[in-house]
């Protein structure tokens, strides 16, 4: 399962009902993954809300949920561009931003479910059940 920044932020902030849904999805997830650039985005968002302690908050959560960090390759960069061309802001109602496009690309290349909060990813080709999006035809 590929984890988006929005899911981590919802969990850390205790956003209801999303935090509960994210926690349940992570509890049932096998090897949740976040790409390295998404980790950077997540740390920036958490730092804006919590200050320098954000890294400690993130690392504790990462340890608790068994979140691994994946590399981001040239293939990921090309898939990110394709995601933007198809679903990017100003191009599609999903209006994916830069970080969203990177998460989408990581999920696409790994053909993994996507854990995210918000109305953007459900506007893509993922079939969402709660906070988890699946590729069409995959449950």
Swiss-Prot record:
A single GO molecular function term of this UniProt record: magnesium ion binding
Domain of life, source organism: Bacteria
Binding site for Mg(2+): 4, 100
EC code: 3.1.-.-
Cofactor(s) needed: Mg(2+)
Record flagged with keyword Magnesium: yes
Entry keywords, A to Z: Hydrolase, Magnesium, Metal-binding, Nuclease, Toxin-antitoxin system
Ranges for domain PINc: 1-127
InterPro entries: PIN-like_dom_sf, PIN_dom, Type_II_TA_system_RNase, VapC_family
Hydrolase listed as a keyword: yes
HAMAP family, per the entry: VapC_Nob1
Chain's role: Toxic component of a type II toxin-antitoxin (TA) system. An RNase. Its cognate antitoxin is VapB36.
Assigned protein family: Belongs to the PINc/VapC protein family.
Name of the protein: Ribonuclease VapC36
Originating species: Mycobacterium tuberculosis (strain CDC 1551 / Oshkosh)
Gene assigned in the entry: vapC36
